[in-house]
Amino acid sequence: MPKRPTPSRTLVHVQELHDAPLAPLTTFRLGGPATRLITATTDAEVIAAVREADDSGTPLLLIGGGSNLVIGDKGFAGTALRIATTGFGLDGTKVELAAGEVWTDAVARTVEAGLAGIECLAGIPGSAGATPIQNVGAYGQEVSSTITEVIAYDRKTHETVTIPNAECAFSYRHSRFKADPERYVVLRVRFELEDADGLSAPVKYAETARALGVEPGDRVPLAAARETVLGLRSGKGMVLDPEDHDTWSAGSFFTNPILTEAECAAFHARVRERLGADAVPPAYPAGDGRTKTSAAWLIDKSGFTKGYGSGPARISTKHTLALTNRGEATTEDLLALAREVVAGVRDAFGITLVNEPVTVGVEL
């Protein structure tokens, strides 16, 4: 068992609970308790809590909005640190967000300020501090396009560091922070947005353009872009609603596979074999000769339709990419469904899907 740290004077103002349930802190509403749960509301409290855990050798779990976590039914034997810092700084087109800021609220404030660049990321659950870790993206925008710097606590050097965009190693749903999750604790994120006289950034995503009645590349009023994306997300159960079990999820559970040229050729052969010579899977250039295809398409064509499942964990009735808790599920129920989907897609198309949420105390 990990050592239970003795509370230090630096943590006297933080909220501290023992044997605290973690399920209410996740959008899945799943997972067992933590040995200790600390809620930090300032950067100093975050750093002090991290240092205390590290100095005592206590396992540490960082929790922001809880929208990207799958916590095991046995919980977490260590300190769970809930980052609840707040702060929205605006200087011209520059925006600085504290890690604990609710992301979708921050997007709304930038739209109200007339700034373009993250309006199509409206409705994504979670906190601002998670966005650079995952390189959050949707509907044609990624935060890597607008982040200028990430301020983080470096657990290796015990210093607060400022990491410029070029050193964040951003790629599809990935970054240096995700690659080395035990090293950095994101404290603040800085963005450079665009003042386009009340207009959005050029609309890149075809579905968004169709919904707006414009061509890809056009600009539209900022508020219209945000509201349209919120509508699209709501229709897929991707905007949190406690009354809608389709939103008791982590959003997209699997990342879209990126295939090499050889893998893509083998995939297309499997598609033709299974679906016929005229079948054409989704394909998007991913750089370096690679191709990205759709995880949702793979899941659907493997026989897992919307609403699939008979137990308390099922595929969303609105979107095949979301696995959901129908109210009485356990984490093991969810993982059993995820494993079934992964195995089915692998058998059908030879592609192994990779989970997007972080797993804690369990493996897929």
UniProtKB/Swiss-Prot annotation:
Its EC number is 1.3.1.98. Disulfide bonds: none annotated. GO terms for cellular component: cytosol. Its main location: cytoplasm. The active site is at 173, 252 (proton donor), 356. It is found in: Cytoplasm. PANTHER family: UDP-N-ACETYLENOLPYRUVOYLGLUCOSAMINE REDUCTASE. HAMAP family: MurB (MF_00037). This is UDP-N-acetylenolpyruvoylglucosamine reductase. It comes from Streptomyces avermitilis (strain ATCC 31267 / DSM 46492 / JCM 5070 / NBRC 14893 / NCIMB 12804 / NRRL 8165 / MA-4680). The gene is murB.
